[in-house]
Amino acid sequence: MAFLALGINHKTASVDVRERVAFTPEQLVDALQQLCRLTSSREAAILSTCNRSELYIEQDHLSADAVLQWLADYHRLSIDELRASAYVHEEHDAVKHMMRVASGLDSLVLGEPQILGQMKSAYAVAREAGTVGPLLGRLFQATFSAAKQVRTDTAIGENPVSVAFAAVSLAKQIFADLGRSQALLIGAGETITLVARHLHEQGVRRIVVANRTLERASILAEQFGAHAVLLADIPQELANSDIVISSTASQLPILGKGAVESALKQRRHKPIFMVDIAVPRDIETEVGELDDVYLYTVDDLHDVVAENLKSRQGAAQAAEELVSVGAEDFMLRLRELAAVDVLRAYRQQSERLRDEELQKALRLLANGGNPEDVLAQLARGLTNKLLHAPSVQLKKLSAEGRLDALAMAQELFALNEGSTDKSPQ
């Protein structure tokens, strides 16, 4: 049994290469079955995200070159082009790498939690494809346990390190229960999409997406059960909004002090939490002067992100130690597992010899044999049969000068120099 982890990621390959090596969800089952069939891999799983494509494999004999060639052929790349960006981890290093990936230690955003869910999806697809067996299955379970321990025992996932997540985290500090809050998101780009996802996951009661074009606002809104409006509708929506987060490419402010003052009057001065992520700013700076407005800018969030990233980097050291222990423990249990088949066969052989001698003894007793004599004969016969094969092999090893094997046998049978009878001088 041998483990292999092979792939590319955001640190080793450009976006162009990562896009060309990525697997679509529809490709995965067929790709896994083909991978096992063409590379002599007994078990396999594929993790494919925007930042990485990795193959996790169990083989009788490691063959990284064959797997790399298959990956190049599958995606119609030259082997040299792929080899320039690929990395290979074997055995213990492969186990440790999987645990680091699942724990977010190898992610673009240190400690990000989404990767664990993606790893679990990779395992589920491999099970569907029938390419996960007992060994890779055990490795995945150990990997999930290690990642859970990292999350539980360290602070690596506690502090937000993206602007979008930081904005939502600040909102949670202002509003004890986001499930009772309404949010107005201005813009429909990547950052606002992330904000919408985080707010949706937090159970915000109602989300409104305002954008220059209704089409783009609607596309985003449909993903999270939100409502889409135009920028011109913002004044009407503002009065119902507890949270306002804006990120557009506008060169002029979209939200002014007068519109916010009017909304606050309608809200009877119920506070509004605002985050302006845009550069240039979408919200006039004077809005921050209003008593019932909590206005944060992108610079405020960057300070939070920088401090939190520093905190995560400190937690990463403890996480790395947990992963190292987890990998060592898994390899130890795997080595112990290798002896199970031998022990099972030896036990079956011993039980067969025992049954043979027992049947012989029962026949002697049935024929009137003396019980003490029968028991003595049973003991001698069983001892001789159990020792026969080891005795023959030990004599053979001794004749061949295999002193190392003899020493191992002495350890195996828990013998020492004083345990054997010596011939009289």
Swiss-Prot record:
BP terms from Gene Ontology: protoporphyrinogen IX biosynthetic process from glutamate
Subunit details: Homodimer.
The record's family statement is: Belongs to the glutamyl-tRNA reductase family.
Q: Does the keyword Magnesium apply?
A: no
Quote additional remarks: During catalysis, the active site Cys acts as a nucleophile attacking the alpha-carbonyl group of tRNA-bound glutamate with the formation of a thioester intermediate between enzyme and glutamate, and the concomitant release of tRNA(Glu). The thioester intermediate is finally reduced by direct hydride transfer from NADPH, to form the product GSA.
Annotated catalysed reactions = (S)-4-amino-5-oxopentanoate + tRNA(Glu) + NADP(+) = L-glutamyl-tRNA(Glu) + NADPH + H(+)
Looking up InterPro entries in the UniProt record yields:
4pyrrol_synth_GluRdtase, 4pyrrol_synth_GluRdtase_dimer, 4pyrrol_synth_GluRdtase_N, GluRdtase_CS, GluRdtase_dimer_dom_sf, GluRdtase_N_sf, NAD(P)-bd_dom_sf, Shikm_DH/Glu-tRNA_Rdtase
Record remark on domains:
Possesses an unusual extended V-shaped dimeric structure with each monomer consisting of three distinct domains arranged along a curved 'spinal' alpha-helix. The N-terminal catalytic domain specifically recognizes the glutamate moiety of the substrate. The second domain is the NADPH-binding domain, and the third C-terminal domain is responsible for dimerization.
Q: Which GO terms describe its molecular function?
A: glutamyl-tRNA reductase activity; NADP binding
- Site note Important for activity applies to 97
State which gene encodes it. Answer: hemA
Q: In which pathway does it act?
A: Porphyrin-containing compound metabolism; protoporphyrin-IX biosynthesis; 5-aminolevulinate from L-glutamyl-tRNA(Glu): step 1/2
Q: Organism source for this protein?
A: Pseudomonas putida (strain ATCC 47054 / DSM 6125 / CFBP 8728 / NCIMB 11950 / KT2440)
- What's its top-level EC category? oxidoreductase
Q: Which Gene3D superfamilies match?
A: Glutamyl-tRNA reductase, N-terminal domain, NAD(P)-binding Rossmann-like Domain
Catalytic site: 50
Which UniProt keywords are present, listed alphabetically?
A: NADP, Oxidoreductase, Porphyrin biosynthesis
Q: Which PROSITE patterns match?
A: GLUTR
Protein residues bound to NADP(+): 187-192
Q: What is its EC number?
A: 1.2.1.70
The protein's name is Glutamyl-tRNA reductase
Q: What does this protein do?
A: Catalyzes the NADPH-dependent reduction of glutamyl-tRNA(Glu) to glutamate 1-semialdehyde (GSA).
Binding residues for substrate? 49-52, 107, 112-114, 118
NCBIfam families the record matches = hemA
What CDD domains is this protein classified in? Answer: NAD_bind_Glutamyl_tRNA_reduct
